[in-house]
């Protein structure tokens, strides 16, 4: 069984963020929405997160749900499109 730390884009910082979000398994991560995770992390930490955190969340949720590992930066364009449409913004 794959551990969170086995996912391509999960390092120490992301693993710590996932713990803050009470996500401890790949199975728990697979059903998540990257935007919800990003907003919840900002809410729980009361800190404005770097938008690239969303990119990492998108990449790891994708890998957890499909098994396909992608580079986190391949999600940047999608996030920027969401930002332009007003569907992604900071809550802090």
Task: Put a short name on every predicted segment.
Residues 1-8, 12-92:
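C-terminal extensions
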């Amino acid at each position: 069984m794959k551990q969170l730390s086995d996912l391509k884009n999960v390092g120490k910082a992301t693993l710590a963020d996932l713990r803050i979000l009470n996500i401890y398994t790949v199975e728990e991560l697979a059903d998540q929405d990257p935007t919800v995770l990003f907003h919840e992390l900002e809410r729980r930490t009361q800190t404005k997160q770097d938008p690239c955190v969303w990119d990492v969340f998108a990449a790891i949720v994708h890998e957890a749900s499909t098994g396909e590992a992608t580079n986190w930066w391949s999600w940047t364009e999608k996030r920027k499109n969401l930002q332009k449409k007003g569907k992604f913004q900071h809550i802090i």
